């Protein structure tokens, strides 16, 4: 929606522009930061009224979402990612304040080797063209700052979704830079050729696509006989039954009211922001387990499918197990 918003703004189609901005804001609260910068860029380019209204809408939504809506829905807690910025504080206000009053901390993080690699891998595929349109590239700046100051390594890894908003600004700046530099047909052809070349080279070097050198590095699951066993096991589970399943199986068992990644709900893991409001084990009718992936959860699993555990195996093949809750059995208590 950010790409469409810019395109519509450049054509002064303000009604549809407002729709695109609304969709962008509805995607995630931090998309508002990019919306603020997009609005300011439009204001600088001469669309002052629309740009400032856009920036105000983005800022207002960000404050409403982070200060009111998320705490209200989370029992008073702010956004969970506030904990991802060690050295800057434990609340949104502290984080922003310390970034402003201690710029050296921000600079130190932003210039580390892995961050410089991140910038290179984001900009090199588009031939560094966005640097020729710095005003538009500002759309990417807030999310880039968030990503490179975060203590979560995946946020400054170009392969993950955390870079999606950054890339929106990068591609918009690429288009604007090429429009500015490619004013003649020859220049446009050269710029397009350079862009295609750098994109293909970067794809081969860094992407997991069929063209990439990383295609066979284990990113994609290869077809194997065990997959037929998994499909057979999944067919055993009724579509409305509550399930707790291994992490590689649970995506295939969603679209139901109760679907948990094992060891949830007995042992609360990756649940909520802080493990609050743990689910009820009584909602689990079936276990669907890949025994090869149990690790330190094996004792819990063996208790559940043991004589007093309450679950009886209905399917077991090649380490894939489906167990159904029996009418009687010992219930394992949830713990955190």
Question: Each predicted region: which residue ranges?
Answer:
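Transmembrane helix irregularities
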Residues: 9-10, 23-31, 43-46, 63-68, ...
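Membrane-interface alpha helices of multi-pass inner-membrane proteins
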Residues: 3-8, 15-29, 34-43, 57-60
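Aromatic/acidic, Gly/Pro-rich catalytic loop(s) in extracytoplasmic/lumenal soluble domains
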Residues: 289-336
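Extracytoplasmic
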Residues: 209-308
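Hydrophobic/aromatic-rich transmembrane helices and adjacent perimembrane loops
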Residues: 138-183
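Signature aromatic-anchored transmembrane alpha helix within multi-pass, membrane-resident enzymes
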Residues: 56-60, 181-208
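Membrane-interface junctions at the ends of membrane-embedded or membrane-associated helices
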Residues: 10-17, 42-50, 174-192
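Membrane-lumen/periplasm interface segments of specific transmembrane helices
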Residues: 48-140, 175, 198-202
């Amino acid at each position: 929606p950010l790409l469409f918003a810019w395109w519509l703004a450049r054509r002064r189609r303000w009604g549809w522009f407002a729709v695109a901005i609304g969709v962008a804001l509805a995607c995630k609260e931090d998309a508002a930061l990019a919306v603020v910068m997009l609005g300011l860029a439009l204001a600088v380019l001469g669309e002052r009224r629309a740009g400032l209204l856009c920036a105000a809408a983005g800022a207002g939504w960000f404050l409403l979402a982070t200060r009111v809506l998320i705490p209200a829905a989370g029992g008073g807690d702010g956004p969970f990612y506030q904990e991802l910025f060690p050295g800057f504080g434990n609340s949104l206000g502290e984080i922003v304040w310390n970034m402003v009053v201690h710029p050296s901390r921000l600079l130190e993080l932003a210039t580390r080797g892995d961050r410089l690699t991140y910038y290179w891998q984001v900009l090199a595929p588009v031939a560094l063209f966005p640097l020729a349109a710095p005003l538009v590239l500002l759309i990417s700046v807030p999310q880039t700052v968030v990503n490179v100051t975060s203590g979560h390594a995946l946020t400054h890894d170009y392969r993950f979704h955390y870079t999606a908003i950054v890339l929106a600004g990068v591609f918009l700046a690429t288009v604007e830079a090429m429009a500015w530099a490619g004013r003649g047909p020859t220049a446009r052809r050269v710029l397009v050729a350079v862009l295609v070349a750098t994109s293909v080279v970067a794809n081969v070097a860094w992407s997991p696509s069929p063209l990439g050198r990383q295609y066979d590095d284990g990113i994609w699951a290869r077809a194997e006989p065990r997959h037929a066993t998994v499909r057979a096991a999944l067919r055993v589970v009724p579509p409305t039954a509550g399930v707790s399943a291994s992490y590689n199986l649970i995506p295939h068992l969603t679209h139901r009211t109760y679907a948990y990644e094992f060891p949830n709900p007995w042992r609360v893991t990756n649940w909520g922001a802080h493990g609050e409001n743990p689910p009820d084990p009584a909602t689990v009718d079936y276990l669907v387990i890949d025994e090869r992936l149990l690790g330190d959860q094996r004792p819990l699993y063996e208790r559940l499918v043991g004589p007093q555990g309450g679950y009886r195996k209905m399917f077991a093949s090649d380490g894939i197990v489906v167990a159904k809750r029996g009418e009687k059995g010992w219930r394992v208590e949830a713990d955190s």
